[in-house]
Amino acid sequence: MGIQKESLISKGQVSKCIRKLDYENYEEFKNACIQYLDLISKRKKFLNPHQSFETNVLHFTKDFIQNIQYMINHINLKSIQKLVQDIKQANKVYLYAHGDVRSVCYNIQRELQIYDIQTIICDADFNKDYHFLDNDILIVLSTNGHSFHYNKRVIKRIKESHVDQWLITCNESITLCQKQIIVPLLDEKYSEYIIKYMIDILLLELQN
């Protein structure tokens, strides 16, 4: 571990810090850092520095609305209703996500708590042993599947989990869970925004 030389602290202190961040070891922490840097490098830019802020906002809004309309016209709304039905009937709802879409888990958890639905957000690397019971469901959110590229162990653990599973993703080539909702995209650049909007629709359906 070369990091202790650069940071001028002991190997034991580095390991302790890493464990406090919920990582099992340095290798896992390093892979997470590589993944994060990769996500940053792929981050989309929407604002044109040569245009005014007002023009940028208008262009973004116009394109965003077009992408929303495309998604609504092509998504399987019955699948969303089925997932909502499963959520309402679930004993516990487990949520797992990586990257930007992980923040959505907290929105879902907050909304489900309103309906007294127990919700657990799984750790970022799916390391903990979750004791899934009958009527529990696991919802996996992945905008484009890039996160899974770095961690095959997570894929293996999810597939081996004995629990009813749902995957919500914009990438139709991922076959991870028994049940899937594919979020159609007009422009891949808007994937993070469109998948979050789709979750908002799902949460609206919970009110029925």
Locations of the language-model features?
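Short secondary-structure transition/capping segments
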Residues: E27, I40-K45, H74-L77, F126, ...
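Hydrophobic packing residues in well-ordered alpha-helices of helical domains and bundles
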Residues: T61, I80-L83, C105, I195
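HTH-adjacent hinge/linker in prokaryotic transcriptional regulators
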Residues: M1, K5-S79
